[in-house]
Amino acid sequence: MSATKMNAQEIIKFIADAKKKTPVKVTFNGELHGTIPWSVVKLGNVLFGDWEEIKPLLVNLEENKTYVVEQDARNSAVPLLDKRDINARIEPGAIIRDQVEIGDNAVIMMGAVINIGAEIGAGTMIDMGAILGGRAIVGKNSHVGAGAVLAGVIEPASAEPVRVGDNVLIGANAVVIEGVQIGSGSVVAAGAIVTQDVPENVVVAGVPARIIKTIDEKTQQKTALEDALRTL
């Protein structure tokens, strides 16, 4: 599913202009009186909607006036992505904000956090607890390891985002700093902190990350991806 690609200025405007909402689920006993706004959904004795619109309804709740409120955000500007029609595997607990583009057969694992404007290529896996900041771009058939961070750039608007090429492996807990580009076919070792651009088909490691060798057959075997994990 393709989102409308937005540059930094458009994302900033999107957030600034968005109506800030506190989405809630309210389960209640008793009878509601008064008109329910069109934006509030009522299913039996459960209400879904913005707290600012639901709160006045509860004042008119008759009988025992018992209700429970469930919420996970306050004055949120960016909703979560509607994942229903995305042709990818997205596991429970992944947090993906609106205006994110996810390619076919990508895999998003539990606990991954993907911010507004990020792009994930077809067949790419974002592993458990990895973070893709705003506007971060990952190419096709790559792997971002567990706990890795691709730094986001929303402000300043002139800054360049992180760009990761195709067939790249980023090891667990690695960090890629704002504006860095990782060339296709390269490997970033676990725990590395990448502060400069990385050319294609090399291995980088360390803090700060430095090139330690070019990709050879042994490295390719160790870092090969499993297509079966991307089958839907």
From Swiss-Prot:
- Presence of keyword Transferase: yes
Looking at the record's lineage, which domain of life comes first?
A: Bacteria
E.C. number? 2.3.1.89
Tell me the GO molecular function terms: tetrahydrodipicolinate N-acetyltransferase activity
Pfam families from the entry?
DapH_N, Hexapep, Hexapep_2
Coiled-coil positions are none
Cite the entry's keywords alphabetically.
Answer: Acyltransferase, Amino-acid biosynthesis, Diaminopimelate biosynthesis, Lysine biosynthesis, Repeat, Transferase
InterPro entries in the record: DapH, DapH_N, Hexapep, Hexapep_transf_CS, Trans_hexapeptide_repeat, Trimer_LpxA-like_sf
An example GO biological process term is: lysine biosynthetic process via diaminopimelate
Q: Give a yes or no for keyword Chloroplast in this entry.
A: no
Give the catalytic activity. (S)-2,3,4,5-tetrahydrodipicolinate + acetyl-CoA + H2O = L-2-acetamido-6-oxoheptanedioate + CoA
User: Which pathway does it serve?
Assistant: Amino-acid biosynthesis; L-lysine biosynthesis via DAP pathway; LL-2,6-diaminopimelate from (S)-tetrahydrodipicolinate (acetylase route): step 1/3
Protein task = Catalyzes the transfer of an acetyl group from acetyl-CoA to tetrahydrodipicolinate.
Indicate the family of this protein.
Belongs to the transferase hexapeptide repeat family. DapH subfamily.
PANTHER family, sorted: 2,3,4,5-TETRAHYDROPYRIDINE-2,6-DICARBOXYLATE N-ACETYLTRANSFERASE, ACETYLTRANSFERASE
**What is the recorded name of this protein?**
2,3,4,5-tetrahydropyridine-2,6-dicarboxylate N-acetyltransferase
Native organism is Streptococcus gordonii (strain Challis / ATCC 35105 / BCRC 15272 / CH1 / DL1 / V288)
Lineage of origin: Bacteria, Bacillati, Bacillota, Bacilli, Lactobacillales
